[in-house]
Amino acid sequence: MSGKKEKKHFIVGVIMVAIIVAATATMIYCYINRFDPQEYVQAFLDVSYKQKTESYIKQTGISEKEAKQVFEDNLAYTMEKFPEHVMTDEMTEEYRELFADLAKKTSYTVGEATREENGTYQVVLTVKPITLLKDTYAEFQEKAQEYATKVSNDVMNGQAMPEETQMQTEIYQIYYEVLSQAAEKGLKYGKPNKIVLHVEKDKEGKYEIRKADLQNLDH
């Protein structure tokens, strides 16, 4: 009789241990695979603007090559706004390097996340905008006018009128020189703006930042 009780206690003990181990394993799994919207937003911004890939790879499970491509795609999107027919290959590379450097100096702070009833997270982002374009606009206008005056005087003195594409190329070169020289002296930042980012699941159940919010980041 005593042996049966001991056996019963042993079996119960084994079952309890199994339950505890299973529960602990579940807790560990949930902890390891927990989703932190604040960390996700930080990782996404860092890979997008500063080309820091490590955290984003951990968050999404993508390869390093894919993570690096996020930064490259952002640069490509920026360069699409420039007309290819007036940009030389050398000039395109100069602008690309300039914008890559500016992106890495973007200033942002990721705030705490709050969860909505539908499971969407709201993350407040504080951004200090770089004011380089605004700060250099007057100087660019002045130098562009100087170039226009020079072309006008040259034509008045009998020289051929440059083709429109050639003049546009020259203007973009002037603009690059103004921007790069000002950037070398040090960037200035405007007043901080707060932007609310919504992190929600896509059709596949993976979290992502709402596309409309991403568009607001670039304006």
Language-model regions: role of each:
Residues 120-122, 190-196:
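Intrinsic-disorder/low-complexity, polar/charged segments enriched in Ser/Thr/Lys/Arg/Asp/Glu/Gln
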Residues 127-133, 201-203:
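Beta-strand elements of well-folded, non-transmembrane domains
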Residues 117-127:
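A short hydrophobic beta-strand element
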Residues 198-219:
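C-terminal/domain-terminus segments
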Residues 133-190:
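Mixed-charge, low-complexity intrinsically disordered segments
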Residues 29-109:
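Core segments of small alpha/beta cavity-forming domains
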Residues 110-112, 194-201:
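Hydrophobic/aromatic beta-strand elements that line small-molecule binding cavities or substrate pockets
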Residues 1-56, 123:
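Gram-positive cell-envelope targeting signals
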